[in-house]
């Protein structure tokens, strides 16, 4: 989306966390990843990916110990591009700690 703000929020978050943690951060920009709408013929749980971009996406996510998703809320939900990226994989997400940082025009709620 033009004028997106996730990068600014992610940069701010990384600076805040750098004060109190030794975690290493890498940015994954789904615009740069540019996955097409899910087009694998087999379910992701099988891990039998036919497309090279799916195998690359799988390898990238598998290389991380945990994830922090930073994304805008659209109509109280998450963006379709994120849903699509999540749907491409299955086992790669299993047992991986995840945090969500969201923002939107309607205000935010603290979720626990």
Language-model region placement:
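N-terminal beta1-alpha1-beta2 submodule of the flavodoxin-like/Rossmannoid cofactor-binding fold
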Residues: 1-71, 76-84, 88
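Hydrophobic/aromatic residues located in beta-strands of well-ordered beta-sheets
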Residues: 25, 95-98
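Short, conserved loop/helix-junction motifs that constitute active-site signature segments
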Residues: 89-95
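Short, glycine-/small-residue-rich phosphate/pyrophosphate-handling segment
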Residues: 97-112
